């Protein structure tokens, strides 16, 4: 299913590329275009990721990735079932701006591989690289349930967006991995839908339409 969605997304990007606003490939040297594509993918990812933590229905999709109380490479594959779909509206902006869909796809795979490496406790501080890149240390913070670590370090490849937009937090104390309210189950179906069940239960008990909208689009009531 993931590969089908990836293929459909690539096809959509090629379609949208016909309506690009800027002919970037004719303006920039190819090596600059590649670098800029990596930067823009991470820029879009930062906001997609940040919104996924602050909008309730997107958090219901994303929270399964944070449900593990361990931190290792396997956690990077603990992905939300509907995650690839939720990303589409955000990343479709890139081909519309004029970024080549083929370069987007390749750079996206490389960025994903970097993200996989970030899910580990084996790699410590990487010195000067900590200022620019989202290192394993920074990503451990992102998976922390410690109060000061919640909703921090959203970047995938770079940490510069977090530094710019005020969501950066260094790894100063041991990280307690998982959710504030842990799921206490290994059942993938329960983990995937428990956030949705909470949303619909809250909507069912809402007093008016505005309150129902808040439960769906507002921030998570309890930061799970």
Residue ranges and their predicted role:
Residues 1-5, 28-180:
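Membrane-embedded catalytic scaffold of the fatty acid hydroxylase/desaturase
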Residues 8, 31, 109, 153, ...:
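Alpha-helical structural motif
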Residues 8-32:
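Juxtamembrane/interfacial segments at transmembrane-helix boundaries in multi-pass membrane proteins
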Residues 12, 129, 161, 196-200, ...:
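Generic structural signal of hydrophobic/aromatic residues within well-ordered alpha-helices
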Residues 16, 20, 137, 165, ...:
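Generic secondary-structure transition motif, activating predominantly at the C-termini of alpha-helices
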Residues 174-224:
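Cytosolic-facing loops and C-terminal tails of multi-pass membrane proteins
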